[in-house]
Amino acid sequence: MPYIPHTPDDVRAMLDAIGADSIEDLFDEIPSHLKAAGKLDALPEGLSEMDVTRLMSDRAAQDAGAVSFIGAGAYQHHVPAAVWEIATRGEFYTAYTPYQAEASQGTLQVIYEFQTLMTRLTGMDVSNASVYDGASGLAEAVLMSLRANRKSKSRKVLVPTAVNPRYTSATQAIVENQDVALERVGFDAASGQTPLDALKPYEGEDYAALVISQPNFFGSLEEVDALTDWAHANKMLVIGVVNPTSLALLTPPGEWGADGADIVVGEGQPLGVPLSSGGPYFGFMCCKQKHVRQMPGRIIGRTVDMEGKQGFTLTLQAREQHIRRSKATSNICTNQGLAMTAATIYTSLLGPDGLGNVAAHCHANTQALADKLTAIDGVERAFTAPTFHEVVLTLPKPADQVLAALAEKDVLGGVSLAGDYDMNNAILVNATEVHSEQDLQLFEQALKEVLA
């Protein structure tokens, strides 16, 4: 049955009201050669719900099963069943911060708890209610740094090439029409880190901020203390891009160097959000208290009403688009509420010890995988720097060729670095707590056969 509720008389009345002769007139700006003539005959006839279910089940059964060692910004973690059982309850199941928000005290408290968790995890003073994802979060941080750094009049930001290329390209797309320049800083070919030597040409120059990724795209751990102190000595703010899982083991960005990072962003997907064809994910964003009025996104505050009862409210709303219009800190006027709720539940269920165990298993499995693979002739670690849960390996054959052969053996063996870094024989591999010893052995055996 059709699901269009308008009768021919309804359609005629609406067309008369807007002065159009036909529905086709509404689309006259589309060139005729781009319009489909007549019906779309290739479309099959409609099916019943039962038949659609059967059809989609049959198609899903055709999917090939494979063990994945792909990371590069989106990571496979175990998500306890309780996380989404709670997150999808009717009380929580919403996509974003509700309008008339103070009427939804439960939702606001969840966001407030999320903000508290993120500040504790990052060691920062303030968190917002989340942004769209980690990549756009970096763009927001870059724009925020221009407003927040009162010691600089620059519209330029230093971005190491070891930052996730997807983050950099997304940031470039967002800021390039706002008169912002991203100056690229190279990495050390031996360590895979951003060395202080690479920053020497920028000493004394006017830049708004330096971006530091920890770990960086190669999985290498940066010398964050030295980089942070260098940036501050040169009157730049520090934007930290971090993996939240790693913060259970690594020094939080709020404690980098003598004064800590100024702004921190990252992808929240590892905190209880399953992999799903690129989303929906969520980004987190934290900063020092003194920069809070330059932070984009919604912020939930806790207060007390006239009767002395605790209450939660949207605070500092004058920063936001619905009030400041074009002068707002960002055009983000909502948040990724559902994914953020799942992350709050996930982090609360695991607690500090549980999150630490996840991080420790990720690190241990990655080191074990690297040891197994580098025992194969011709396979070596590309860099000397310590890593968290990703590592770059060089191969005796082209990476794309090897990865294609591994896929035929039901092993998704990582990400080729040939396109982004012109490292034709290098792959970025990842292991997390979900990978068993059997999975690691499967990868090892498959790679041996491919390279034989």
Curated annotation (Swiss-Prot):
Catalytic reaction annotation: N(6)-[(R)-lipoyl]-L-lysyl-[glycine-cleavage complex H protein] + glycine + H(+) = N(6)-[(R)-S(8)-aminomethyldihydrolipoyl]-L-lysyl-[glycine-cleavage complex H protein] + CO2
Cross-referenced Gene3D superfamilies: Aspartate Aminotransferase, domain 1, Type I PLP-dependent aspartate aminotransferase-like (Major domain)
SUPFAM superfamilies for this protein: PLP-dependent transferases (SSF53383)
InterPro entries assigned to the protein according to its UniProt record, in alphabetical order: GcvPA, GDC-P_N, GDC_P, PyrdxlP-dep_Trfase, PyrdxlP-dep_Trfase_major, PyrdxlP-dep_Trfase_small
Organism domain of life: Bacteria
Top class in the EC scheme: oxidoreductase
EC number: 1.4.4.2
Function, in words: The glycine cleavage system catalyzes the degradation of glycine. The P protein binds the alpha-amino group of glycine through its pyridoxal phosphate cofactor; CO(2) is released and the remaining methylamine moiety is then transferred to the lipoamide cofactor of the H protein.
Entry's family note: Belongs to the GcvP family. N-terminal subunit subfamily.
Assembly with partners or alone: The glycine cleavage system is composed of four proteins: P, T, L and H. In this organism, the P 'protein' is a heterodimer of two subunits.
Listed HAMAP family: GcvPA
Record protein name field: Probable glycine dehydrogenase (decarboxylating) subunit 1
Classification of source organism: Bacteria, Pseudomonadati, Pseudomonadota, Gammaproteobacteria, Oceanospirillales
